[in-house]
Amino acid sequence: VPHFSKLRLQQLAILLGVWALWLVGGALETSSTAQVPEKAPLRWGERAPGLHLQPFRAPLRHRNSRRYLKNQKILLLVFGDIACPAYHLYLPRIVGLKEKIAELNGEILWIYPHALDSNLIPYPGAKVFKDLLGQSMGAYRIARLPTLVVLQKDREQARIPFLWSRKIRLGNWSIRYVGAVDQDPEGRAIGIRQDLVEALRDLTQSSYVRIPATRTHGCP
């Protein structure tokens, strides 16, 4: 009987130890979560983070060549994902802004978290990039795909290199708009505000955007 009681006590002590470790682990996890709050979205006027991207199937003659964002005044960053239904719903409306962006001396950069088949690029000649490690999505605090980010050049700058397979430095560019094309992913509403179009229209007058951030609709 004494031997049986001692064994039971040892088992009970082990169970109590495991339970105590579980409680401590839960407390540490809660404390860690509380100490690292979720980052807020980028806001109008903030400096644009650099982009760490890989080009989509760059020709060999371009892999080590330099290109420059010399004449562009506006950049539209499209963070998309072909696996997300909302991306395909919004895609025609984003592509439809290509001429408007060009009128503003702008460029569209299409950024995906995955490789892309050539038949899935938005249009011939589109500047498509891969963010395989999620560095650019993290830097721009992207929570849902698709998300559109409009950047504006603050002033004339020296020749800042736009390099294949390297970081795109955007030191003199600032955030002007972050959000969706509009608040109607399915495109069925009549008379709904065209948020991205209005932001681009504002930028033809100044750097001020009346509504610089909107809710995004898509996949986390």
Can you describe what each PLM-predicted range is?
Residues 3-16:
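Bacterial N-terminal signal peptides that target proteins for export
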Residues 13-26:
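Bacterial N-terminal signal peptides
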Residues 33-67:
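N-terminal "domain-start" segment that seeds a small globular fold
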Residues 52, 123-164, 170-171, 175-176:
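Short, internal strand/loop/helix patches
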Residues 65-88, 200:
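Short active-site neighborhood of thiol/selenol oxidoreductases, capturing the structured segment around
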Residues 72-75, 104-107, 126, 145-146:
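Loop/turn elements at helix/coil->beta-strand transitions in domains of secreted/extracellular proteins
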Residues 88-139:
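Structural microenvironment flanking redox-active thiols in thiol-disulfide oxidoreductases
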Residues 164-220:
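Thiol-/selenol-based redox modules, centered on thioredoxin-like
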